[in-house]
Each structure stands twice: as C-alpha cells, then as structure tokens.
C-alpha cells in the first residue's frame, strides 16, 4: 500500500495511514511512504506494518567512507533498519535535489526478495 508524503515540517503530512491499513490486519503488509521519518513517528507506534519502503534522503548526494551528513537529519537515512518485527528500507535513489551532482552516494536501485518463512 502507499500513502501521500508524510515528513517532518516543512514537508507535508498528508498520509492517511489508518485508512490505508484498514482490512490488512491478518496480511503481511508493505507500505510505501516517501519520507523515512514517517516510520518512527507514525508507523512504529501506531501500526503493525511489516515492511516500509522509503526514500527522500538521497544521502544528501554525498557520502564519505559510508557516512553522510543526512545522518544528522534522518536517523534512518540509508539501508535496512529493524525494530522488533517491523522493518524499514531506505533507498538513496537515483536522482538529485538542486545541483545535478553525487559523490559517493551513487545511484541505487534495490531489488528485494521476499520469502515465506513457512515452507
């Protein structure tokens, strides 16, 4: 399922998470939400969504030795994060914001393979 952008101000907060999750209680749920701050602020405390996919950070288009200034704004800025049974994946994307420039934060396309643990 997907929701409208829901980020920290000045970004909009228009996600209708409750409406989006209606009727999904017994299903494995995957949420697409643009901003990773939505996970800690709304998804973790209010839902049992299994996997959230986010982007937004672009790793601020620069990483050095695996670190980025985006860490200061986004606790979850790149990669896989787990909290209990809930998982967040943040993709740093392929584009840019502002200047058409990337250094170390090379464009990323992610392929996730989901497997049923019950065989």
Language model segments and positions:
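Soluble catalytic domains of enzymes that build or remodel membrane lipids, polysaccharides, and related
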Residues: 1-119
């Amino acid at each position: 399922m997907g929701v409208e952008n829901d980020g920290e101000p000045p970004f909009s907060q228009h996600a209708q998470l409750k409406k989006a999750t209606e009727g999904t209680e017994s299903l494995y749920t995957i949420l697409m939400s643009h901003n990773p701050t939505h996970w800690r602020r709304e998804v973790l405390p209010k839902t049992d969504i299994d996997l959230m996919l986010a982007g937004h950070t672009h790793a601020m288009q620069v990483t050095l030795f695996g670190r980025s200034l985006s860490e200061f704004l986004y606790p979850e800025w790149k990669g896989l994060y787990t909290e209990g049974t809930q998982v967040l994946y943040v993709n740093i994307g392929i584009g840019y914001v502002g200047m058409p420039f990337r250094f170390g934060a090379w464009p990323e396309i992610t392929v996730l393979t989901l497997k049923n643990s019950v065989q």
